[in-house]
Design a protein with these regions (language model features):
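N-terminal basic, low-complexity leaders that serve as flexible interaction/assembly modules and, when applicable
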Residues: 4-110, 346-361
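N-terminal small/glycine-rich loop or linker at the start of catalytic domains
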Residues: 34-65, 95, 100-112, 118-122, ...
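Short gly/ser-rich anion-binding loops that grip negatively charged ligand groups
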Residues: 63, 67, 130-137, 262
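Glycine-rich, proline-tolerant flexible connector loops at the mouths of alpha/beta enzymes
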Residues: 90-107, 120-121, 127-133, 160, ...
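A gly/proline- and charged-residue-enriched helix-loop-helix capping module
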Residues: 111-149, 154
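Active-site loop segments of alpha/beta catalytic cores
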Residues: 136-361
């Protein structure tokens, strides 16, 4: 049920989608299943450690602090757009930022990832969770506004972690290999799980809505850990929370993208939460993903990050194969099938962008 097609836009007249800046950009055209003026491409984690200018900008500043300093977050978001000529900026943030803004004790520990002061594992823990106040989102709005002012006709994509991934971090208290904690809670204590997933859905939706209202031209929901779930559990315990998160955003009318890793078997229910575009990781060819989805939505993806260090002729052949497979879908935005590895040579990404733009849309 694509969001933008069924919702009148409620954005301000000065929003980039409304004032003519981005509505006909290659990215937004492809997201809407229309023929773009050139093939759009951007990269998940394009703003990050692969760029020397990013490492310099972040010197002495922690990850979460970097996300909450509007001028720094804006500069980091803009860096790969300047360098690579990609067709979108992706807002620089972290999945756990909405938790931090709500007042949940969380930090990024080097070599580990997000770590919570107190995991959330009981009904009492969930009941004690704070509310995300609207004013807490002001640094996000400011960063988006600064970024959009610089991007001009290049759209900004808003970013939020999906409720399951947020809740999984909260139950485990840190990254996990098998996500046994949240998967067990779904069945052992479904009421507590539902309450936690609902809380996560609300903060995720608030976070994404704030970015789009402030100027982002699209939004992407990242469900990093959804691939750990079987289809039945996803549909019963996770999809309703993702619907709830997007319900707070869909009325804005901006295109919405849904991406997770290892999600080849749940692409249909991921689409059915109410998005316009489905991101596909590197494990499934795009023509097969399109077949599974019945040719109903544009796709995004799915260059294998492992090939970024391959000889150029090997990588070029792979990129061309991705473009060819993507042509089966109603629309295609080229991306990686995962985030940019920190050790990636930035020149390789620039070269991929040039190659994509040289292929007729």
């Amino acid at each position: 049920m694509p969001g933008w097609q069924n919702c009148p836009m409620t954005l301000s007249p000065s929003h980039p989608l409304m004032d003519g800046r981005t509505a006909e950009s290659p990215l937004i055209s492809a997201y809407r299943g229309l023929k773009p003026s050139r093939r759009p491409v951007w990269f998940m984690r394009q703003a990050g450690r692969s760029l020397p200018e990013y490492r310099k900008a972040r010197e002495g500043t922690g990850m979460l602090e970097s996300c909450l300093l509007p001028e720094l977050a804006s500069e980091i978001t803009l860096q790969p757009v300047r360098r690579h000529d990609v067709d979108a900026g992706i807002f620089f943030s972290d999945i756990v930022i909405p938790l931090k803004l709500a007042g949940v004790g969380v930090d990024i520990v080097s070599g580990v990832g997000p770590v919570l002061e107190s995991p959330v594992r009981t009904a009492a823990d969930v009941a004690a969770l704070p509310t995300l106040e609207d004013s807490a989102l002001d640094p996000i709005r400011e960063a988006v506004a600064l970024t959009v002012a610089e991007l001009g006709t290049t759209p900004l994509i808003g970013f939020a972690g999906a409720p399951f991934t947020l809740a999984a971090y909260m139950v485990e208290g840190r990254p996990s290999r098998d996500h046994m904690g949240p998967r067990s809670m779904m069945h052992a204590d479904p009421e507590t799980w539902q309450a936690l997933a609902g809380w996560a859905a609300d903060v995720s939706g608030q976070f994404l809505r704030a970015q789009i209202e402030a100027g982002a031209s699209a939004g992407q929901l990242f469900d990093s850990w959804a691939g750990s779930l079987g289809r039945a559990d996803y549909e019963r315990f996770v999809a309703p929370a993702s619907v709830r998160a997007l319900d707070g955003v869909r009325s804005l009318g901006a295109p919405l993208v849904h991406f997770g890793t290892g999600t080849s078997e749940i692409l249909q229910p991921m689409r059915d939460v109410g998005v316009d575009v489905v991101g596909v990781d590197y494990r499934l060819p795009l023509d097969e993903a399109n077949r599974r989805l019945g040719g109903t939505v544009p796709l995004q993806g799915n260059i294998d990050p492992a090939l970024l260090t391959a000889p150029w002729e090997v990588l070029e052949a792979h990129v061309r194969a991705v473009v060819e497979a993507g042509s089966a879908a109603p629309g295609h935005v080229v991306n990686l099938g995962h985030g940019v590895p920190p050790t990636t040579d930035p020149e390789v990404l620039t070269r991929i962008v040039s190659l994509i733009h040289s292929i007729e849309p």
